[in-house]
Every structure is written in C-alpha cells, then in structure tokens.
Amino acid sequence: MPTLVLSRHGQSEWNLENRFTGWWDVNLTEQGVQEATAGGKALAEKGFEFDIAFTSVLTRAIKTTNLILEAGKTLWVPTEKDWRLNERHYGGLTGLNKAETAAKHGEEQVHIWRRSYDVPPPPMEKGSKFDLSGDRRYDGVKIPETESLKDTVARVLPYWEERIAPELKAGKRVLIGAHGNSLRALVKHLSKLSDEEIVKFELPTGQPLVYELNDDLTPKDRYFLNER
C-alpha cells in the first residue's frame, strides 16, 4: 500500500511578519525549525520511513524536508527539488503585509485574491525588487507574473503525474515538503475536492498530512498525524 506524506514548511520569516511570500525566498524562523523537527520526530516515532522525497526550490521547504528526514535519521534519502512545487505566485502582493493590503484595497478584495479559486492577484510590476527573472534557479522557466490557485494546480499536477505518481505506483514511500497552495493542489486532486472545498482546506505549518493510498493511488485514508 503506497504511503504519501505531505508537509507544509515550518513557520517562515514572512509568515511571522504576515506578508505575502509566494516565490520569494525567505528562511524558516526558529519556531519553523522546531515545527519541522517536531513533525519529523513524530513521523519517526510512528514508524514512518521514506524512500524518496520531493520539494520546491525555496529554502523554507527544502529545509523543512531536510529537517523531517534528519529527525528520522534518513537525511540520505534521495530528494528532488523542482520549481513546480513552489508556492503560488502572489504577483504584485509579494512582500506586502496582509493587514496593510486589506486597509489599502479593502478586506473583501484581499479575501477574493487569497481565497478564490480562479482570481489571481494583480501582476507584479516591471522592475519590482521581487522580480526573479535574474535568478538562475529559474533558467529556462517562464516565471508567472501572478497566479490563482487554479494556475498553481495547473503546474503542480503535470509534475505529480510525471515524477511523483510513478514512484508511488512502484511502491515507494514518498515525502513531499512544500507549500500551502502547492499542497492544496495535490489534496484537491487526490481527495477530489471541489473548487469551493479546496480554498477552505487549511494546512498548518509543519504538521504532516498522511495519505494511505490504494495501488491505483485513490485514497484509502487521509489524516493529519496529530489526529492519530
């Protein structure tokens, strides 16, 4: 029976500052390190082991994945990094404080940008200090100007089908350390959630979500580790 564990990264510096982060690369806070380590220890104590791990190309997710593996004394497990597991791109909201943004644009508009399925935030302005066009980790990648959750799903699922699903079908035990919205894309796909259901689905930082899957990768069970 294939096992899949999804873990959102631990608290980041911009989670703490209540800023829209998206593709911008920020580090974990001390609390974030503790969350990731605690999640890894809880997985190890409950007998979870992994054969392969997948993560994004952003520091907060990479470190979380490594801390989970290290807690289980399996830092040697092969880990693949790919930009398609990055967080949703928040476009022109990147770097802005969420409360300040609500004061400027209105809480209702910000709620639509954050929690609608198919409405993206305004695009990032040309010349923004958060422009990533010169970042070599994205060589050959068409960096989005902004993304809705629907757009995020559209880039995550091909990677799932191409790289992750085959490992699970081969019986591998898989860990994915990523972000709230890229993981929502996978939960929507696996659990067949509607557009309305997935925007309400919350993934706490550093809390592993376990899928026990049938051989055809339909879910047999899904639960947060702290629920069992």
UniProtKB/Swiss-Prot annotation:
Residues reported in the UniProt entry to bind substrate: 8-15, 21-22, 60, 87-90, 98, 114-115, 180-181
Residues passing through the membrane, by range: none
GO MF annotations in UniProt: phosphoglycerate mutase activity
Catalytic-site annotation from UniProt: H9, E87
UniProt EC number: 5.4.2.11
InterPro entries: His_Pase_superF_clade-1 (IPR013078), His_PPase_superfam (IPR029033), PG/BPGM_mutase_AS (IPR001345), Phosphogly_mut1 (IPR005952)
Example GO biological process: gluconeogenesis
Catalytic activity: (2R)-2-phosphoglycerate = (2R)-3-phosphoglycerate
Keywords assigned: Gluconeogenesis, Glycolysis, Isomerase
Coiled coil regions, renumbered to chain: none
SMART domains cross-referenced by the UniProt entry: PGAM
Residues under site feature: Transition state stabilizer: H179
Highest taxon of source: Bacteria
Recorded metabolic or biological pathway in which this protein acts: Carbohydrate degradation; glycolysis; pyruvate from D-glyceraldehyde 3-phosphate: step 3/5
Self-association state and partner proteins as the record states: Homodimer.
UniProt similarity note: Belongs to the phosphoglycerate mutase family. BPG-dependent PGAM subfamily.
PANTHER family to which the protein is assigned, alphabetical: PHOSPHOGLYCERATE MUTASE (PTHR11931)
Record HAMAP family: PGAM_GpmA
Function summary: Catalyzes the interconversion of 2-phosphoglycerate and 3-phosphoglycerate.
Protein name per Swiss-Prot or TrEMBL: 2,3-bisphosphoglycerate-dependent phosphoglycerate mutase
Annotated source species: Zymomonas mobilis subsp. mobilis (strain ATCC 31821 / ZM4 / CP4)
